[in-house]
């Protein structure tokens, strides 16, 4: 069977009406009457199987396994009159890629056209379009039909024939994503459009209100093309569902896997995307493993990008640096992974509950991993054992949402000794009941100048320092450095005695920072 490619533009508002409209508007010839020039309509049925050529991949990139075909599920199939170009009927393939479409015809030659649109239910559609907003289509060769005929026409969309098989991989990957979301939320996501074409050099990203844009092998990607990068596709799908089902405050921008100082809004957003590709694959491995394109033995938590020189990382087995703190996207992904499975093994349902039902309610503070932590506590009211477990999951990535070794230190009496000069103490700004305050005592000598300073700020910390005199009331110095996250106060002791360094989260912290965080306090003599 010969095939050819078309990119078509059409009104998507008549997907299921064409058959009815054509049957109603084309006049039928009545028996014994003068039919004049009206065409005689006959019925026939076309059945078949639609499949596309996929690519198997693993940690080292594409494996080269061929031929490797998969059913093209839920895609739009049109029966087109060869002579007039009219679409006689439409339907969709099922989960096996099979279709069966009855139609009326008056001329004897038609062809089957497969369009780059998947229709899962009503308005829950997925489209892949070119940057000029045209749908892709693959057509069979023309064939003759006769009244009452049932004709089989299979369509195999193969790379070797120069067909846009990658377009239909994009459709199928996102169809799996839609099914994943429905299993969690009870409904498919709203319509999604992905934009891809050969040579697109504008990057891969999700744009709210528009869709997902994918590299096509040129420009900034250095030849990278993403139509078969399933993990990259699902990463962007994670941004899409965050926009449609949750809340995403990310400012966007450049991000690197080893960057431990990202804007917390960005690290959360990208970490959710990194986690999403693993979560979808994990769900598929349990529910429909035939939809996966990974080679045997590849973990669901392995993220693969087949750009030029393929790279991958396994975020489930990471240990130590450099992937740590709330400001690192991989640390966020691993934390979510170990909540869903692994260490925590709570399943995806509570993760989705916080994502869908709590995060959209957050106001006054940005959505980041702090907000997700707060949501877990709010949605689950965990007992002590669960709280300790999730604290361990977070602290494995040095995300310290728990009491530090110096607590309780919210008051002027602390169990541990006063801090010594030049000694560094690491503190966590965290209190589940409200804003945390660390009060650190030290012994000062009258007439001596000192510098109290915070440094090594992690997890989005932004500190504000006050130094209080021995009467515990008089403030002898304060600093809320509005241009830097760290703070420092220089002062001279007016008398011998115990002075107190009070550290809180800055009230003027930028949106990139957090309410919590980790810092190191040191007092030095000037």
Model regions and ranges:
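Zn2+-dependent metallopeptidase catalytic core
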Residues: 100-104, 151, 155-193
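Short, ordered, surface-exposed loop/turn motifs in non-cytosolic proteins
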Residues: 53-84, 189, 460-463
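Short, acidic Ser/Thr/Gly-rich low-complexity loop/linker segments typical of extracellular
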Residues: 81-98
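Bacterial Sec-dependent N-terminal signal peptides
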Residues: 23-48
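C-terminal edge strands of extracellular/lumenal beta-sandwich accessory domains
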Residues: 401-419, 438-441, 458-459, 466-472, ...
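Non-catalytic, beta-strand-enriched accessory regions in extracellular/secretory proteins
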Residues: 421-450, 464-466, 484-490, 500, ...
């Amino acid at each position: 069977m010969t095939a050819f490619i078309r990119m078509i533009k059409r009104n998507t508002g008549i997907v299921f009406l064409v058959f009815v409209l054509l049957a109603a508007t084309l006049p039928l010839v009545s028996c014994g009457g003068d039919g004049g020039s009206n065409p005689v309509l006959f019925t026939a049925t076309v059945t078949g199987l639609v499949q596309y050529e996929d690519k198997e991949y693993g940690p080292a990139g594409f494996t080269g396994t061929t031929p490797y075909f998969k059913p093209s599920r839920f895609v739009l199939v049109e029966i087109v009159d060869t002579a007039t170009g009219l679409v006689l009927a439409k339907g969709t393939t099922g989960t096996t890629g099979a279709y069966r479409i009855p139609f009326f015809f008056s001329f004897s030659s038609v062809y089957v056209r497969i369009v780059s649109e998947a229709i899962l239910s009503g308005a829950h559609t997925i489209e892949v379009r070119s940057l000029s907003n045209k749908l892709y289509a693959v057509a069979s060769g023309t064939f003759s039909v006769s009244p009452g005929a049932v004709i089989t026409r299979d369509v195999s969309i193969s790379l070797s024939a120069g067909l846009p098989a990658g377009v239909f991989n994009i459709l199928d990957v996102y169809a799996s994503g839609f099914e994943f979301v429905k299993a969690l939320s009870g409904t498919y996501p709203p319509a999604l459009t992905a934009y891809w074409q050969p040579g697109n050099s504008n990057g891969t990203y999700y744009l709210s209100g528009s869709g997902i844009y994918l590299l096509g092998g040129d420009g900034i990607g250095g030849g990278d093309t993403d139509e078969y990068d399933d993990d990259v596709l699902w990463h962007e799908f994670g941004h899409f569902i965050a926009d449609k089902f949750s809340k995403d405050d990310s400012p966007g921008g450049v991000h690197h896997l080893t960057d431990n100082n990202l804007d917390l809004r960005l690290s959360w957003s990208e970490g959710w995307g990194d986690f999403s590709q693993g979560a979808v694959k994990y769900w598929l491995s349990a529910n429909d493993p035939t939809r996966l394109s990974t080679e045997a033995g590849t973990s669901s938590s392995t993220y693969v990008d087949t750009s030029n020189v393929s790279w991958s990382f396994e975020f489930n087995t990471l240990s130590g640096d450099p992937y740590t703190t709330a400001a690192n996207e991989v640390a966020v992904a691993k934390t979510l992974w170990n909540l869903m499975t692994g260490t925590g093994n709570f399943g995806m349902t509570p993760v989705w509950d916080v994502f869908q039902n709590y995060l959209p309610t957050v106001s006054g503070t940005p959505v980041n991993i702090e907000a997700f932590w707060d949501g877990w506590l709010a949605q689950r009211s965990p007992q002590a054992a669960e709280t300790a477990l999730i604290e361990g999951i977070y602290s494995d990535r040095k995300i310290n949402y728990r009491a530090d070794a110096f607590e309780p230190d919210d008051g002027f009496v602390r169990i541990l000794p006063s801090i010594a000069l030049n000694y560094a103490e690491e503190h966590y700004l965290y209190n589940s009941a409200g804003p945390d305050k660390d009060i650190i005592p030290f012994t000062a000598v009258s007439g001596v100048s000192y510098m109290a300073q915070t440094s090594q700020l992690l997890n989005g910390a932004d500190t504000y320092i006050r130094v209080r005199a021995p009467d515990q009331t008089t403030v002898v110095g304060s600093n809320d450095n509005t241009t830097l996250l760290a703070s420092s106060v220089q002062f001279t002791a007016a008398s011998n005695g115990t002075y107190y360094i009070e550290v809180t989260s800055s009230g003027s912290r930028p949106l990139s920072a957090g309410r919590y965080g980790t810092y190191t306090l040191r007092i030095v003599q000037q």
